[in-house]
Amino acid sequence: MQEASAAITAERKHSHVDICLNRPVCFDGQDTGLDSWRFEHNAAPEVDFAQIDLSTEFLGHAIGLPLMISSMTGGYGNALALNRALGEAAERFRIPLGVGSMRQALEGSSHRESFSVVRSSAPSVPIFANIGAPEVAAGLSRDQLSTLIDLIEANGLIVHLNPAQELFQPEGGTDFSGFLDRLHDITATIGVPVIAKEVGCGISATVARKLADAGVRAIDVAGAGGISWQKVEECRYLDRFGHEERFSPSALDEFLNWGIPTAECLTSIQTLKRQNPEYDALSVISSGGIRNGLDIAKSIALGANIAASAQHLLKALHSGTLEETIRTWANDLRAAMFLTGSATIEQLKHARIYRKP
C-alpha cells in the first residue's frame, strides 16, 4: 500500500516538472513588484568593480553568492540526473540547495537515491531537506523527519506552506489544523535550522511573526510573480477531468493568481523586524519570480539575506545553460553593487532604493 502511494507521488512529481517546463503557469496580471523599485545611482562609488565581494553567510554557512537553488524536484526516476546536475552547480558556485518535497522518500524506497545524490554531488555546501505543512500537521514524527535529514545529510529542514496548491491539487491535503503547534515541536527537537517556505503565494508579516514564534530560523517568502502552483494543479485537474467544476468561473482567475507579490512580502517583513528587535535574527529568503541578479540585489536592499530561484534555473538546466545563467546573475548582482557603491553584500543591504513614482 505504501509503495503504491509512493508511485502516485512519484508520478505527480514528474508531472509537476513537465508542466512547469512546458506550460504557461506563471502569474498573469500580477508580478513580483520588484520592477517598481529603483536603486539610487551612485556616481562616485569608490569601489573597484573587480574587488566586489559577493560572498555572504546564511544560517551559519559561508556561501559564494546570495543565491539558493530552490526546492524543485526528487522522488522519481528522471529526478536523479536533475538533482545531480543541480548539486554539481551548487558545489561549483558554493551556493545552498533545497531538494523538492521528500514525502515520497517516506512512502517508499524506490527513488531515494534521487535525493541522496544531491549530497554526493555537493559535499561542502548547505543542503536542505523538505517536507510539506500538511504532513507536519498530520503528525509526522521526529524519527521520520530525522530519516529525511539523514538521507541527504541535510544542514536544515524546509517546511513548505502550500494551502493554495493543495486546494487546487486533485488529491490535495487541505487539513492544516494544528500546524503551528506541531511546527513548534519540530523546531524545538529536530536539531537543525527550520526554514518555512511558501511556494508562490507569499508570506505576510503577520504569518512571518507566527512562524518565527514557532521557532523557524528563516522565512522563504516565495511571493506571487513566478510560478502559480494553482495553475500547475489546474493543468493536472483539467488533464484528468476535462473541465473545471469546483469554482465559479468569475472567481477562478483570481484564485489562480492569488498571492502577495514578492516585494510586498519583503518590505512588510523588513518593517516587522525593524519595529520588533526580537525578530532581528530571522533570516529572509526572497523567491517567487526571481529572474536575474538585479532582482537579487533589489531583494537584499529590501531586507532579504539571500534570494532563491526554481523555475528559471530548472529551465536553464534543461537548455544546458545552468552555469552560464548563474554566472550571468552573479555579474548582474556585481553590477548593481558597483553602481550603488556597495563593495560587500552587507553594504548592499544599506543601499538607497526607492519606489518608482
Curated annotation (Swiss-Prot):
Residues reported to bind substrate: R12, K13, S101, M102, R103, Q165
Catalytic activity: isopentenyl diphosphate = dimethylallyl diphosphate
Binding site for Mg(2+): E166
Pfam families: FMN_dh (PF01070)
GO molecular function: FMN binding; isopentenyl-diphosphate delta-isomerase activity; magnesium ion binding; NADPH binding; oxidoreductase activity
Binding site for FMN: S70, S71, M72, T73, S101, N130, K197, G289, I290, R291, A310, Q311
Cofactor: FMN; NADPH; Mg(2+)
Location of the protein in the cell: Cytoplasm
EC number per UniProt: 5.3.3.2
Disulfide bond annotation, renumbered to this chain: none
Coiled-coil ranges from the UniProt annotation: none
One GO BP annotation of this record: isoprenoid biosynthetic process
This protein's UniProt keywords: Cytoplasm, Flavoprotein, FMN, Isomerase, Isoprene biosynthesis, Magnesium, Metal-binding, NADP
Highest taxon above the source species: Bacteria
Subunit structure: Homooctamer. Dimer of tetramers.
Family: Belongs to the IPP isomerase type 2 family.
PANTHER family in the record: ISOPENTENYL-DIPHOSPHATE DELTA-ISOMERASE (PTHR43665:SF1)
Role, per record: Involved in the biosynthesis of isoprenoids. Catalyzes the 1,3-allylic rearrangement of the homoallylic substrate isopentenyl (IPP) to its allylic isomer, dimethylallyl diphosphate (DMAPP).
Name under which the protein is recorded: Isopentenyl-diphosphate delta-isomerase
